[in-house]
Amino acid sequence: MRITATVRTKNEEKNLRRFVESYQWADNVLIMDDFSDDETYLNEVVSEFENAQWKQFPGKRVAKEGITRAPHGNHINALFDWAEEIGTDWIIFDDCDCFPNKLFRSSAREIIEACKQDFIYLVRIYLYKDKGYFPYMSKPAGDWEASAYAFRANQGFRFSVDESLPYIQTFVRPDESYVLRLMPPYCLIHCPWPDDEAIAIKRDRYSRTYGERYSRFDPLNFAGELDNLEVWMD
């Protein structure tokens, strides 16, 4: 069985090596870049890890408010097309600032190979700088909430190309039996807010791309209270 991890990049110098290193149990790590300012880090990472390769997004890019980028849906779908073209049984898709915790990595291959469902969901743990994590982001209704992480290839799973709904998943799952939901201590570690600079960059990009409501973007305003990390959150 072949397992392929996929990720989009644009100026991800701080995150890419950690992402690829966390998927050394996968057969391939496919990186599709959106014209980073400097390609050096991409070449350095793929030269270090034999299962990694990268290429530029091949489609048409869009410009809005001074930001030129690959459309979300087209970029993601191009990654999925690439994975299926080279041949794979399972596709993992995640952000470059997210990675599976050590406990999941130690058994990930066996879990995926034994999975009878078409989708695997995992819980994301949202870290804030080095100060802890936001429990609310992982369990907004009180219980752990898992989201899409991996899916069986060649089933037609693709993202919407409607830019107003960039993350709508167009593959219809007939019922919950098609999903394997994994709960902590298996998890994904998400690091979207490592420092003030990263928060400011996100605030600027999101407000220009999605509107004024993001101009005051700060996780301390919407992500709930911070809590200390558990031992399995690494």
Model feature map: region roles:
Residues 34, 94-95:
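Active-site acidic Asp-centered loop
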Residues 2-4:
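Cell-envelope/extracellular polymer assembly enzymes that use nucleotide-activated donors
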Residues 66-81, 99-234:
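Catalytic-site signature of metal-activated, phosphate-bearing donor transferases
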Residues 11-25, 31:
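Short, well-formed alpha-helical segments that are part of the catalytic scaffolds
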